[in-house]
């Protein structure tokens, strides 16, 4: 399982080959990335020429933005994905709990380092005694499920008492209005790791920058595992500018709240029950593959989950894209009931 290829959203090259539609003709709604990205100011020439210096500035700004206990509790990384792959090697072998439908990199990252896996019930107050670790996204990708901080801290206490740890991936939390749901301020606690990403809310997935928040001793080991220069000079410039622009952040949260509600309402109007964050809607429906395939035939790419038939749809960027999605749904949804009864070849996405 650990060595199986993992497919993510945003794979337009694959979509173009499969459906015979040129790459630039696609409307890509397959990710939960903000389509209204932060306008990065011009990058200074030195950011390109010089090696990035670990002067603590980026960690200090991140600590203020995320409300972490301090800069010593923050490690800049090349996207939270880098930390997800590296962290399991720092823990003694055990059993990790992962939600049945979650980010597809979690379980393989732990399996790669000899850990076993078990399903995680995000509604449970008490974790199974067999679990040593748990990794949970809050809100979850793709189901949009949220776990309240009281339950998360209860889980953390249970796991630490067993010599384990809790990892909370808050990659999609920046767009949420309730900052108090974050555990970033609690990362002085041993056995707690919080992962944050600038790719989703700020729409800067291409800069590959994120942060691991934890006790300094664990971050020192993670720093050694990842090596030097994990975040490039241009990426540091972009992230610092994004953190400093509080007015943009406030306006964008309001815009995404509106757009996220609009997308959920549009899908409901076409007969799909949805669970949503401000950045995407998710629907578990027998017609999920038929919907994914029908939209793809019209050049609209979504994220289909084959092992738990469901589809995730991200935000359109502008009015033309909204109309294109609405027209495609109106044209194809009436045919989906029949299409859903026909067998489909296995889809590699998961």
Predicted feature residues:
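PLP-dependent enzyme catalytic core of the Aspartate aminotransferase-like
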Residues: 150, 297, 307-350
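PLP-dependent aminotransferase class I/II
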Residues: 191-267, 272-273
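Conserved beta-loop-alpha segment that forms the PLP phosphate-binding cup at the N-terminus of a helix
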Residues: 71-96, 106, 210
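Short beta-strand
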Residues: 28, 76, 195, 272-277, ...
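Conserved PLP-anchoring active-site segment centered on the Schiff-base-forming lysine
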Residues: 88-111, 116-119, 123-124
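N-terminal "arm"/small-domain region of PLP-dependent enzymes with the aminotransferase-like
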Residues: 1-56, 61
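Active-site phosphate-binding strand-loop segment of PLP-dependent enzymes
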Residues: 118-176
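Conserved PLP-binding catalytic core of the aspartate aminotransferase-like
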Residues: 257, 265-298, 315
């Amino acid at each position: 399982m650990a060595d199986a290829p993992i497919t993510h959203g945003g794979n337009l090259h694959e979509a173009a080959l499969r459906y015979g539609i040129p790459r630039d003709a696609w409307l890509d709604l397959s990710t939960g990335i903000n389509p209204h990205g932060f306008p990065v100011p011009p990058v200074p020439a030195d950011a390109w020429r010089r090696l990035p210096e670990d002067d603590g500035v980026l960690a200090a700004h991140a600590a203020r933005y995320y409300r972490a206990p301090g800069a010593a509790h923050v490690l800049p990384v090349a996207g939270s994905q880098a930390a997800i792959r590296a962290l399991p090697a720092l823990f003694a072998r055990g059993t990790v709990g992962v939600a049945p439908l979650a980010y597809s990199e979690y379980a393989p990252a732990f399996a790669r380092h000899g850990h076993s896996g078990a399903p995680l019930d995000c509604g449970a107050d008490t974790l199974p005694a067999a679990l040593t670790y748990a990794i949970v996204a809050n809100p979850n990708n793709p189901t949009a499920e949220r776990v309240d901080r009281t339950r998360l801290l209860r889980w953390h206490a249970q796991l630490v008492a067993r010599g384990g740890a809790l990892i909370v991936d808050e990659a999609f939390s920046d767009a949420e209005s309730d900052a108090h749901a974050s555990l970033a301020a609690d990362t002085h606690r041993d056995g707690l790791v919080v992962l944050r990403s600038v790719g989703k809310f700020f729409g800067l997935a291409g800069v590959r920058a994120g942060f691991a928040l934890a006790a300094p001793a664990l971050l020192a080991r993670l720093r050694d595992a990842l090596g030097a220069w994990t975040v490039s000079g241009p990426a540091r410039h972009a992230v610092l500018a994004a953190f400093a622009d509080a007015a943009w952040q406030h306006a964008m949260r309001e815009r995404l709240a509106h757009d996220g509600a609009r997308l959920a309402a549009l899908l409901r109007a076409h007969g799909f029950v949805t669970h949503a964050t401000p950045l995407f809607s998710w629907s578990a429906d027998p017609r999920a593959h038929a919907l994914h395939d029908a939209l793809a035939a019209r050049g609209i790419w979504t994220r289909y989950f084959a092992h738990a038939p469901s589809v995730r749809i991200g935000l359109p960027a502008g009015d033309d894209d909204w109309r294109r999605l609405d027209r495609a749904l109106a044209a194809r949804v009436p045919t989906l009931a029949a299409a859903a009864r026909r067998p489909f070849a296995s889809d590699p996405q998961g």
